[in-house]
Amino acid sequence: MQRPTTPLRRSNSRQSDHEEHYPIVESVLDMAIGEQMAELADGMSALDRNLKDLQVIHTNLNNFNESFSTLIYGLQMNAWCAEFHNGPRSCDFARRKEVEEMEERARRAQMQAERDRMAMQQIQETPTRLPSEPSDGDVTYMRNDNSFIIQPPSSYQSQLPSRIPQSSRASRIRPPNSLRPPRGRGLYLRGGSRGVTGGRGSYTGVGRGSGRPASEGTTRRWL
């Protein structure tokens, strides 16, 4: 039994038709694009060389970046872990504290100077009042401190009349009676052998101030 035959593809038929109607001459093709293709091949080879050189440069840069980054990282770790000048130390903290204290003192001094300036400006703007002379009332009050009532002068004491009448004052002064025996026990003689005994009594002096000496205003009285 024979297999059925299949017809040829149309592409093959078209190619055959094209070759039949438009024949290709190899000599003409080589002359037309041969030089351009040679130049293109030279450019592609140069591009390939340049890309290879660029790849080498990129590889070298990556190696340098890795090495340099490792060096920087090691220096940073050394600054924080070992005695490195860039790392903070105890003296750095003390110096920082001193700087902060100096800044605080400068700020306080500036504020004090500003307050003093404002106070001086306020004093200059306030009108000054001249001291006025004391009035008569003030002078009288000041002179009353040494008044004649507290310390009366001697001339005033001598001119001051006595308020006690002369008659009543004379009647009150009684001289002692020599005929009247003084009261008390043991004043009379009781027998010749016992003698004279003195009686009890009191001697009082009453004085009244009337601007006279003490001898004139003193009354002696036996009780």
Curated annotation (Swiss-Prot):
Q: Where is the composition biased (Gly residues)?
A: 192-210
Q: What does this protein do?
A: Component of the DASH complex that connects microtubules with kinetochores and couples microtubule depolymerisation to chromosome movement; it is involved in retrieving kinetochores to the spindle poles before their re-orientation on the spindle in early mitosis and allows microtubule depolymerization to pull chromosomes apart and resist detachment during anaphase.
> Assembly and partners?
Component of the DASH complex consisting of ASK1, DAD1, DAD2, DAD3, DAD4, DAM1, DUO1, HSK3, SPC19 and SPC34, with a stoichiometry of one copy of each subunit per complex. Multiple DASH complexes oligomerize to form a ring that encircles spindle microtubules and organizes the rod-like NDC80 complexes of the outer kinetochore. DASH complex oligomerization strengthens microtubule attachments. Within the complex, DAM1 and DUO1 may form the microtubule connections. On cytoplasmic microtubules, DASH complexes appear to form patches instead of rings.
Its primary localisation, in coarse terms, equals nucleus
Organism superkingdom: Eukaryota
Q: Keywords of this protein's UniProt record, alphabetized?
A: Cell cycle, Cell division, Centromere, Chromosome, Chromosome partition, Coiled coil, Cytoplasm, Cytoskeleton, Kinetochore, Microtubule, Mitosis, Nucleus
* Low complexity bias spans: 151-162, 180-191
Q: Which Pfam families match?
A: DASH_Dam1 (PF08653)
GO cellular component annotations, sorted alphabetically? cytoplasm; DASH complex; mitotic spindle polar microtubule; mitotic spindle pole body
Q: Where is the composition biased (Polar residues)?
A: 1-14
Q: Which protein family is named in the record?
A: Belongs to the DASH complex DAM1 family.
Coiled-coil blocks: 94-125
Spell out the protein name for this chain.
DASH complex subunit DAM1
Q: Where in the cell is it found?
A: Nucleus; Cytoplasm, Cytoskeleton, Spindle; Chromosome, Centromere, Kinetochore
Region entry Disordered: which residue ranges?
A: 1-21, 114-223
What Gene Ontology terms for biological process does this UniProt record contain? attachment of spindle microtubules to kinetochore; cell division; mitotic sister chromatid biorientation; protein transport along microtubule to mitotic spindle pole body
Matching PANTHER family:
DASH COMPLEX SUBUNIT DAM1
